[in-house]
Amino acid sequence: MYKRCIGFIKLMRVHQPVGFFLLLWPTLWALWITNRGIPDFIVLSLFIVGVMCMRSAGCVINDYIDYDIDMCVQRTIRRPIVIGSVKKQEALWVFFILILIALIVVCVFNNIIAVFLSLIVLGLSIIYPYLKRYIYLPQLVLGIIFSWSILIVYTVMNCAVNKTTWLLFLANTIWVVLYDTEYAMVDRDDDKCIGIKSSALLFGKIDKIVIGILQLLTVFILYIIGIVEQLPIIFYLFSIVGASILFIWQQVLIFNRNREKCLWAFLSNSYVGMLIFVGIVLSF
């Protein structure tokens, strides 16, 4: 029974919270900006639960669809479905339960547009695992998926979708592409052998340069957000300077394209999102 529980925990990546935070941070950025400070506790709690469910659901459906691929990749060869600790049919049921909870959370807001947006991102989440078999930039679609909560926040808070909305969306999408490229650098050799496509393979020898350009773009758009929202100097100190320092550190880590260090670079992005959030919180 214990081993079964561990299998489901690993399937939903409860033991690996970085992915949860990477989805949560942009949601919190939007919540604080739309509320000009601390949002309603119930609204905040509902968004956190929704993010938890959607992140875990994404991991489950990814493992379900990528079962044949995971058997061939060093990093994923011990995943629950691959080793048999969770059956594929069971994984599908877990996915449906998580999606049901997430949809119930959205329905609590009593906003039909938010429900519609949630159904769109659900569709994208199901399609995403297949994309790496056909296109070299699935990271772009992942960026859109991970930025979608920003649109839902603005909808739920009855705020007009404005310049800041799209700047947040764009900054986060670019950020996701760069950090998932760092993640793809970990699996590059395996992906090449089994015919899986990724941005790391697309960018090839200029991967570090492209990541650097994307880092600069992310910082620049954050700077523009600060100007548009008339945020104080504390935002620039934490969000802009803090993120920039971590981006420089990531360049150091990925310099030799060492698998382990590329993974460290990816994981450090949780702190990037946190610093941006802290800067926004201290601004109100």
UniProtKB/Swiss-Prot annotation:
It is a multi-pass membrane protein. It catalyses: all-trans-octaprenyl diphosphate + 4-hydroxybenzoate = 4-hydroxy-3-(all-trans-octaprenyl)benzoate + diphosphate. Pathway: Cofactor biosynthesis; ubiquinone biosynthesis. The chain crosses the membrane at residues 14-34, 41-61, 93-113, 134-154, 166-186, 209-229, 233-253, 262-282. Catalyzes the prenylation of para-hydroxybenzoate (PHB) with an all-trans polyprenyl group. Mediates the second step in the final reaction sequence of ubiquinone-8 (UQ-8) biosynthesis, which is the condensation of the polyisoprenoid side chain with PHB, generating the first membrane-bound Q intermediate 3-octaprenyl-4-hydroxybenzoate. It is found in: Cell inner membrane. Signal peptide: none annotated. Its EC number is 2.5.1.39. Its cofactor is Mg(2+). GO terms for biological process: ubiquinone biosynthetic process. NCBIfam families: ubiA_proteo (TIGR01474). Its main location: membrane. Keywords: Cell inner membrane, Cell membrane, Magnesium, Membrane, Transferase, Transmembrane, Transmembrane helix, Ubiquinone biosynthesis. This is 4-hydroxybenzoate octaprenyltransferase. The keyword RNA-binding does not apply. GO terms for molecular function: 4-hydroxybenzoate polyprenyltransferase activity. It comes from the Bacteria.
